[in-house]
């Protein structure tokens, strides 16, 4: 999710005609993809579930079953934790490994992802419904950059000496926490896998990770690459299964020292409660959002319209960062709405494997129904439906790009996270007013402001109650920058140097010495 726009080679232009003429330059999906990895991955081995249960995985573009996956449960979780604890034990290969070698393993994993980039992008597209070109150019690029970024950090994490009073020599060590439980969502399955494991492994931890039950395929494929890269057995263990069973077992397991979760605020609360009730494990939560995107009259209007469009419709609107509350200054409101509607009507919805497609299906029937219900609530509560608002086609879970105007702050569509292709456009008059309204939310993940006035930009960005603020851009996420939320959008930070702090403990060591000299 390094950019809200799919960045293609320079020879390939964005307009459909040029795109069609340049198809030979684009990567191609893997035809007749064979799903080889459908079992649980523990101790670098593929295992059946202890219960013998399996669950189906579907293609959201067609509603058809792709395959069946072994369903992990509490017993399998216990096995994975034992493997992770053994791999983390004092004197183990992993604990004795030089930090530089950990970095080399992460770099090797990045090499293997690059080698299999088309396969992984095909798998992401097939399993999650996102356009193949987005998966290839955005998601996979983010995976590779994240792995390489933390590979570079592995031998640069260190403590310091401290000039304490008295005849003592004091220094600090940054040590791995231990076994890390990680639970990832279905909207960016592979990218979130990398966001979670890369800093954890960089610091020397071991991992038990649960992919979303809707999208386990790419995570399981990564298990094979992790083994091929040379990570010791037990360092990474992958448990496909369901949140109330495996997710709950991870959150409450006393053998897990830290948990990281990306998903809904509702589930995040349950995880934090379970972590507290069990062994008070450390918790990092990246949760929901209802992000404000503020457009001032002095902004470049065409650019702001396109960025706002991508900011909410990217990845079928299934982004925690989606800029779904768009506040537009009154003097340009009507024109902004007109151009936004024109752009939404041009958005190409279709097969994820069609290179002209901008928007694929929603992830499943449950999410599809939730989005349509919230769209109906917007109509009922008096917002103006400018375009879209309905499902598309007989197969799959496609929804028309939808734009609402005349939205007010008290409407459900302005307060609740829709997680779908629905743009809500509100109007404002003054800077102070829009700051107060933008901050009047339980969430605080990201915010954005579009203006050519640096004073407005800095005033608004400093006032926003959000972990990330973008000025004249949107979805500008990078491996080097910390990411996380204020308020009910979570706690802790992922990515950047800050992400390392979530996976290490600082130990102070003090030695009595005969005499200290400066």
From Swiss-Prot:
GO CC field: cytoplasm
Sections of the chain in a coiled coil: none
Entry's EC annotation: 1.2.1.36
Main location: cytoplasm
This protein's UniProt keywords: Cytoplasm, Lipid metabolism, NAD, Oxidoreductase
Record site feature (Transition state stabilizer), residues: 187
Keyword Cytoplasm: yes
Pfam families reported for this sequence: Aldedh
Top class in the EC scheme: oxidoreductase
Family: Belongs to the aldehyde dehydrogenase family.
Protein name: Retinal dehydrogenase 2
Name of the gene this protein is made from: ALDH1A2
